[in-house]
Amino acid sequence: MTYNRHRILCEPENVDLLRNAFKYVMGQHHFKIDAIVILPDHIHALWTLPETDADFSTRWRLIKSYFSRQCHSQYQGKISTSRQHKGEKAIWQRRFWEHQVRDGRQGRAYGDRDFVNHLEYIHYNPVHHGLVNAPKDWQHSSFHRYVEEGIYDQMWGASERLIFDSDIGME
């Protein structure tokens, strides 16, 4: 999530910068992006990490650092003294939520309910936040790849309001 929920992530140059950050980090610390959505002030992602390296925190730190180094001068805002002393920028909040999907190997075959719940939560999130009426209308989402692969119908999530368990997305 961005610092003070600044709505900067969907600006075209920042979407490109995020893509570059992900590519750079994936080149150094392999992982697969199973699902992702970039919203104006936060990102949701579902990753598969190597069995021998489940360090998601380092990956997020590197992605955020890469992004911040490239654009921080545009977003210099008022930040706390403690953040200034730590060399932090006014782009990202310090914390993030994570959840380890149970048996992700089955999940990639779309059989694991925990995986599917998170996949659907991610792809429906732009609708949940009132940004679009249907997941297909949100440009910065892996939803389109899933439609191309025949996993989702293009109209999924368009006609009914989906409700998720209160703990999904808050891990």
Predicted regions and their residues:
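Short catalytic/metal-binding and nucleic-acid-binding patches
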Residues: M1-E171
